[in-house]
């Protein structure tokens, strides 16, 4: 404790000079802060923080004493200026007194001079008042005269029926003159007569508007008929243009160079654009000439009467009633379109759309009801055509007809079902009237109507007449029915809002051909075909139908506006395949029955004879005579491919019949001569096949011989030196692949040499056996082991 006190004393002694300099610094800082207007708070806090406020007070007092001298100098300077200013004011006092006396003298002189002028001014004011009253009287008289002139002019306009000008005169009187009219009598007269005049004008205009409403009903009916007729004429022109285009395409397809070119002149009419002009009164003598002047006049007058909104509602209500009662759609909405565009707001677009929606809803309901009751395709098509024409007519004016077209599309299936039913009846009648005779055409127009119109010709060369066609009358009759079906289907599908409808037409065309025509032909074949000639004619007809079906699909694509290459790309198989196969099978079956009649002569063949028939057996000669006669007749009717299929089937049947006879109970034993006789018979069949060279190519002739390959291989096996080779798989596959081992075993057993039998061995014991017989015995043994 003593040492620390000693250190403090030393510090205070040595820092005496430092404390004085610190006080001077604080004094300068406080002076500077006061001069600069700074905050003295930090100094105050510091002073009280150290516990020595006397120092701060000392500094503030010192600063105040230092500023007293400055204050005294400033006060002395301003005191001298104030003294000088007081002296200057005292010097001006005498001048002000002299000015006051001068002003008093001037006022006295002015009063003496202005007294006469004031009396003259009073007289002037009195004269001006009198003049003003006279002017007011003249103005009142002039006002009354102008009012009477307007009244007279209004009466003249009322008498001449110029109601608008009469109302303008009345409005002018009411707005410009009536409040200013000085005559109370005249004013009361105007107040009583103006409402009466307006009421009179309103009654007259309403009567004219009522007459127009009655007249526009008749105009709408005629206008609708005219619009539908024009749309129909435009559609007819389009159809004619399409026909010309088809003819040009046909000429191009046939490479005809002599073509005729013509300009297509299109008539510009008011229906084409749907905008007939901007004249609010009438159409100016065009196709849509109807007068709207009474309507617009009534609307204008009601606007003048400030009843425009009332008249709008009145007009809308009356037109709504007319639409509901008359239901004249086309003409009604053509008129409304004109009123919308030229009526100056008489009816709004929303109101027209509301009327249209009402009409469309009612039309759709009526169409749904009528379509559900219809049982005739023609009636449905007529209504569809009319509705589509209505849609075309009103679409030009911007009305949405999609709902109507959707109703038509919804009944597309029903229409086609009815159309299929009608075609089924027509096809049945056409087939029942068929006499199964080739069609005779005496004139070129008959050829064009029955052959060229359906592209049934096989050559571009026109034949000589009379011409006998390979088909019967049922072919062109059915073609006409199918073509009519296609055209009716396209007519229903076109002009209905759907652009790509070929697939729909094709679907129903497939049904017509695959269900209706095919089933009718199958029924005809099963019930009415009783002879070879009839079956041959039906088979020939089927071949022609195959070409006709190609035409049907091309025709449908053409009418639908689809390129032929796309239609060919989507083609399927021949839709009449069932009836075609049935017709050929029926023909083959009847021919087989005929052949079976000749094959009964196989019973007369001596199968154990040792003599070889040089010219073949009797049955084969009869069969060949019949086949040659058949071919010569069939070549004139049947196409080559059909005749080939039928002949192949018949030849295969002959082969099966011979093999069946050899394997049957009729033949107990076979001799070598009998087998060689069969070989002669088969050679005759080969010759017959080879003689068909104009009909068959060499390749086709070889294919035709495969029809009797079974009997040929059987004969070759029996005539071979080593029949045992049949059991060799390689040789069998190469030379005997058509033979059945059971049939071979049966025939080989019958062909065995009787000397090799059990009872024949006694006479030949010890002699050498024939190698062929030995091979045959081995074959029989091997086949028995297999079985």
Swiss-Prot record:
Keyword set includes Transport: yes
Keyword Transit peptide: no
Chief location bin: cytoplasm
Swiss-Prot/TrEMBL GO biological process terms: acceptance of pollen; intracellular protein transport; pollen germination; pollen tube growth; vesicle tethering involved in exocytosis
Pfam families named in the record: EXOC6_Sec15_N, Sec15_C
UniProt keyword terms in alphabetical order: Cell wall, Cytoplasm, Cytoskeleton, Exocytosis, Secreted, Transport
InterPro entries assigned: EXOC6/Sec15, EXOC6/Sec15_C, EXOC6/Sec15_C_dom1, EXOC6_Sec15_N, EXOC6PINT-1/Sec15/Tip20_C_dom2
Location of this chain's protein in the cell: Cytoplasm, Cytosol; Cytoplasm, Cytoskeleton, Phragmoplast; Secreted, Cell wall; Secreted, Extracellular exosome
GO cellular component: cytoskeleton; cytosol; exocyst; extracellular exosome; phragmoplast; plasma membrane; plasmodesma
Function: Component of the exocyst complex involved in the docking of exocytic vesicles with fusion sites on the plasma membrane during regulated or polarized secretion. Involved in polarized cell growth and organ morphogenesis. During cytokinesis, involved in cell plate initiation, cell plate maturation and formation of new primary cell wall.
The family this protein is said to belong to: Belongs to the SEC15 family.
PANTHER family per the UniProt record, alphabetical: EXOCYST COMPLEX COMPONENT SEC15B, SEC15
Record note on quaternary structure: The exocyst complex is composed of SEC3, SEC5, SEC6, SEC8, SEC10, EXO70A1 and EXO84B. Interacts with EXO84B. Binds to EXO70H1 AND EXO70B2. Binds directly to B1L.
Protein name: Exocyst complex component SEC15B
Gene name of this polypeptide: SEC15B
